[in-house]
């Protein structure tokens, strides 16, 4: 929300990992404007500063939510993007802004779309903490909602390793 603050913070950097975002899907239905301001405009601030400062690379964190309901598995980068919430729409918008800077200005960037990262300090609303909480509360039958979707889970340390490898890679 503060392009000058972003630019100042990025001065002297070679690589920027753009991780900032509002991520709680349910809240996006109540305050979509906040998601647009943070996720889309925030990404614009990052890529604009990266272009102006001639950074070596920007790694933009997106989300698997941009794909919506899987049309096929495994999902790959060719899968259509389907906004199913204001959150996912804001992340698609952020991806499009980033892609436009890559195409228009040759800004070296990579968009990463982690799937269901889990680990320490994770939100209690996520699936794994939900299961653990129910078990610790001694419930006899765990309640999860729709059991049909299949999900991949990625431990947070593995996500970090992936980001580091992407930063070290010469490929965009």
For the regions a language model picked out, list residue spans one by one.
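N-terminal Rossmann-like NAD(P)+-binding domain of SDR-like oxidoreductases, especially those catalyzing
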Residues: 1-117, 157, 167
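Glycine-rich "substrate-gating" loop/helix at the edge of Rossmann-like oxidoreductase active sites
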Residues: 84, 115-125, 146-157
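Generic alpha-helical secondary structure signal
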Residues: 96, 126-130
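Alpha-helical substrate-binding/gating segment
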Residues: 103, 129-141, 153-172
